[in-house]
Amino acid sequence: FSFIALADVQAGNEINFTKSGAVQRTAMQVCPDAKFLMNAGDFVNDCNDQEWDWFYEKSCDTLMHITMAPTAGNHEGNLRWGWFDNMFNLDKSAGWNHITGVYYSFDYSNAHIAVLNTNDMYPISEEQINWLQNDMNSSDAQWKIILMHRACYSAGKNINKPDTVIMRKRLLPIIDSLDIDVVINGHDHMYLRTYQVKDDKIQPTEYITENYKG
């Protein structure tokens, strides 16, 4: 099966939300058999009523015809806690923090996908780590995928920022131990695809950073 992955469709005005909506429509045209859409976060820029209205208005013709797995981005977080939880009806896991976003998982065919909240406790709480380990260890799916907003690896300005460094140190050993096949994230506003890596060496897990064009 196929799916669409994109991120950072945020815009600060109606014109740019129209453009991001057009990108999503194009993705559907290019991949008409996609079973679902995974958005790695930052739906809006300033996280206000007007921007959310623009997002849904300009994307509704796409979103009405495909299931979306949303991720909490930092623009759904910073000083605007609670917006993400109010916008999406999700099956929230034990220990989830509705103030900063949510984390959850789902299955499709032979794949198990865990959606993480990288706004949680800069960048991720012990509760969420424990949940991820239990969640992945309880799945026997052929493909195991993680979707999150902030990245462990970056080819842009975020490469040495504290949240990226902490994410790498905190999450990489966990991801490697769980035999995750691929990690998809956003945040950097560029496209990056790594070699398969493990212990910071080229090996099993692949990391893909989506830009606004998915």
Spell out what each predicted region is.
Residues 1-49, 122:
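N-terminal active-site segment of His-dependent metallophosphoesterases
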Residues 1-13, 110-120, 145-149:
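Active-site-proximal beta-strand elements of phosphoester/diester hydrolases
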Residues 5-7, 36-42, 67-74, 117, ...:
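Active-site neighborhood of phospho(di)ester-bond hydrolases with catalytic His/Asp-centered motifs
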Residues 11, 45, 76-77, 152-153, ...:
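Active-site micro-motifs of SAM-dependent methyltransferase domains
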Residues 18-22, 159-178:
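Short, motif-level signal for alpha-helix interfacial/capping segments enriched in acidic residues
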Residues 28-30, 137, 176:
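Non-catalytic positions within long, well-ordered alpha-helices that form the structural scaffold/packing
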Residues 49-140, 144, 161-165, 170-171, ...:
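Extended active-site neighborhood of metal-dependent phosphoesterases/phosphodiesterases
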Residues 150-161:
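Active-site clefts of carbohydrate-active enzymes
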